[in-house]
Amino acid sequence: MRWFAKIDLMVRLLVLAILLASFLPAAGNAREIAQWISHGAIFVLFFLNGLRLPRDEVLQGMRHWRFLIPVLIWCFGAMALAGKGFAIVLVGSLPPLVALGFLYLGVMPSTVQSATAYSSLAGGKVSSSIVAAALTNIAGVFICAPMFAALAGSGAGEMGVDGLTKVFAILILPFAIGQLLQGRLSHWVRERKDLITWMDRISIAIAVYVAFSGAVEQGLWTMIGISEWAILLAATCVMLAFAFIGAWTVGGQLRLDRGDRIAFLFAGAHKSVAMGAPLAAVLFPPQVAGLVLLPLLVYHLLQLVISAPLASRLARPLRPVPDAAACSEPTTTARDR
């Protein structure tokens, strides 16, 4: 089991949550209790997010508009439209709610920890990465649900006004309170970093467990056969390639320096299950949330798989092009001999 211990801890918790939901799903009264626990954990999670996301750094980083505005446009514009396109194309090949999950994936903000960590490993500008991740997550709290509802149209019928009201009460309200109290309590958060990181992970795992419990009760594993899993995996790989290649290309077209271009790559291509799982748990009933979450969970796993070798490759120093003098030097030396 050593190989399992080497896997990212968040991925391990997600796998365990899915396995637990598959073999021991929360049903009946247990599901209602699990939902209340999940909503309470999500409220605390977004309160802590409000305390931690660096408002001052974001406000200062707003001056770097040439970097930040394209990140927002790519993350919530290009990726959202790509997700919409995938949802339309796949609706005949996958269960409708799973196909809709590609749109849900597209409107998610960037990750905070992993995008920043891989940007740092690749030699990118950490300051730009932190500001981009924080800004997309702050924006995501307010715009992900309305954008999904607008692009999904009738496909978002399960959401309704009640769903958006829950988003305000369970996500936006605690996040706003956390931002307001950031000056007073930020030191308390910093002193308990490990504990709060675990609270984050457990909250997300609970949300995934509740969502998948509902999906399993609806017959998830019989509803999606081997061919559908293959299509889901292939489509997610294509969307992942679009995200990474597109973000890198846009960074080049904007003539960003190498550090900013690397930060743009990871901030633009990564998608946050830390936002997606809690939001789905609030927006949808469990039997819907589990199916809608599938593309995001697969994407999240694949983005971690590809990011480690990619960061290592980008971290290698570029081989300098020898100038004319350097090229002529060995010839001169040989002739003198």
Residue spans for each PLM region:
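Helix-loop junctions at the membrane interface of multi-pass solute transporters
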Residues: 60, 113-125, 249-252, 280-285, ...
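Generic hydrophobic alpha-helical scaffold/packing signal
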Residues: 213, 238, 251, 265, ...
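Structural signature of multi-pass alpha-helical membrane transport proteins
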Residues: 1-93, 149, 153-255, 318, ...
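Membrane-interface helix-loop-helix junctions at boundaries between adjacent transmembrane segments
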Residues: 87-143, 148, 152-163
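Short amphipathic alpha-helical surface patches that serve as generic macromolecular interface elements
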Residues: 243, 247, 261, 276-277, ...
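C-terminal transmembrane helix pair
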Residues: 273-337
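The feature identifies polytopic integral membrane transport proteins across all domains of life
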Residues: 65-72, 93-107, 124-134, 229-233, ...
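Membrane-embedded alpha-helical segments of transport systems
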Residues: 73-82, 107-112, 128-149, 168-171, ...
